[in-house]
């Protein structure tokens, strides 16, 4: 790849930006761009997808009936026609850049034009609670493998193989790192703040996690305790296990935070402990939606004996309530009949049961 990846997409819109106030970070913006060659089926397919805080908000697909950037979040619909027309034209320019560099990489790797190949580019930025850049990203991959990436210092490159070394030398001569760093520290951060402002009702909300601990028996006198955090937003969360107040790090299994499918996230952390020692372990949950961190233990279910005692007590209480209701009813009837036994008075024309039985004799 000789030419640097285009950055016009956001640079051309920089004049429209203004400082905004957002909820404490961190927040992120990412663009994932992909081109896939398909010999005999026309030009490579190009797709660009943008995410803010892991939520898709824009998409471009060259295979669409009318290829253009489309909003993928309701809050992006407030952008006017000029915005969409401009970034669509920029996307079509980037589509051409991908096609050219796919052909260039075929030469670098001495590959024929008859196969299917993929070029990917991920770029974006993270900001902290002060609104400033935490980290920037510029990463390229070819055929599913790392190719070249801008290092965290935003000054140097890491090339994955000999072909990528060619690109690294060309980009170093062209000052590409300075070019990308200026974008990441400037326009990327500013556009992220703008999008956070536009989508504040969705992106700046906080949903506190619902947490609990589950118990999973193992062999050899051990059990797994798993601490669950469900239904939280934003995605940033910390789960830790402690033994008698001391944090466990090496012995803890932690899964990546993953979307729940309803706009919230979920995560769990587990630890293997000796059977019978479960109460010595606590799970701590940290999330900005919580007024203070949660501390949880595994709560064993009631034993069979305890359950029977509870059932017996509830049965006695229920019986006492029924007896009390009957006594109250009888006392009330006695008061209503002047205390003469509380017998029911027969209505005019009615017959007692004894009379009816006599009348029915054969």
Curated annotation (Swiss-Prot):
Residues 340-362 are annotated as: Disordered. The keyword Transferase does not apply. Disulfide bonds join 125-188, 227-283. Its main location: membrane. Heterodimer of an alpha chain and a beta chain (beta-2-microglobulin). It comes from Mus musculus. This is H-2 class I histocompatibility antigen, L-D alpha chain. The chain crosses the membrane at residues 310-331. One of its GO terms (cellular component) is phagocytic vesicle membrane. Residues 1-24 form the signal peptide. Residues 299-309 are annotated as: Connecting peptide. Residues 207-298 are annotated as: Alpha-3. Residues 25-114 are annotated as: Alpha-1. It is found in: Membrane. One of its GO terms (biological process) is immune response. It holds the Pfam family MHC_I. Residues 25-309 are extracellular. Keywords: Disulfide bond, Glycoprotein, Immunity, Membrane, MHC I, Phosphoprotein, Signal, Transmembrane, Transmembrane helix. It is a single-pass type I membrane protein.
């Amino acid at each position: 790849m000789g030419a640097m990846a285009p950055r016009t997409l956001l640079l051309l819109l920089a004049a429209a930006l203004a400082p905004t106030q957002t909820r404490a970070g961190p927040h992120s913006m990412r663009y994932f761009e992909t081109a896939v060659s398909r010999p005999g089926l026309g030009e490579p397919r190009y797709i660009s997808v943008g995410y803010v805080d892991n939520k898709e908000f824009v998409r471009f697909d060259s295979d669409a009936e009318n290829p253009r950037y489309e909003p993928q979040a309701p809050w992006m619909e407030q952008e006017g026609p000029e915005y969409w027309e401009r970034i669509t034209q920029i996307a079509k320019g980037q589509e051409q850049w991908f096609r050219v560099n796919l052909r260039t990489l075929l030469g670098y790797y001495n590959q024929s034009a008859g196969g299917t190949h993929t070029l990917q580019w991920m770029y974006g930025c993270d900001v902290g609670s002060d609104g400033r850049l935490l980290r920037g990203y510029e990463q390229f991959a070819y055929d599913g493998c790392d190719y070249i990436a801008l290092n965290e210092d935003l000054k140097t490159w890491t090339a994955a193989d000999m072909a990528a070394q060619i690109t690294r030398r060309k980009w170093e001569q062209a000052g590409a790192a300075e070019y990308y760093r200026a974008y990441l520290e400037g326009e990327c951060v500013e556009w992220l703040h703008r999008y956070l402002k536009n989508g504040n009702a969705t992106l700046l909300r906080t949903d506190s996690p619902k947490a609990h601990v589950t118990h999973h028996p193992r062999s050899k006198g051990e059990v797994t305790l798993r601490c669950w955090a469900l239904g939280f937003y934003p995605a940033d969360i910390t789960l830790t296990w402690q033994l008698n107040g001391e944090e466990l790090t090496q012995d803890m299994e932690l899964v990546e935070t993953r979307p729940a499918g309803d706009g919230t996230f979920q995560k769990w952390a587990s630890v293997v402990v000796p059977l019978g020692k479960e109460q010595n372990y606590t799970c701590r949950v940290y999330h900005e939606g919580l007024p203070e961190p949660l501390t949880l233990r595994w709560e064993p279910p009631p034993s069979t004996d305890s359950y029977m005692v509870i059932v017996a007590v509830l049965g006695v209480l229920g019986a006492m309530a029924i007896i009390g209701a009957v006594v109250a009813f009888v006392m009330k009837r006695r008061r209503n009949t002047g205390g003469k036994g509380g017998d029911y008075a027969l209505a005019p024309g009615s017959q007692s049961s004894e009379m009816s039985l006599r009348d029915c004799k054969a």
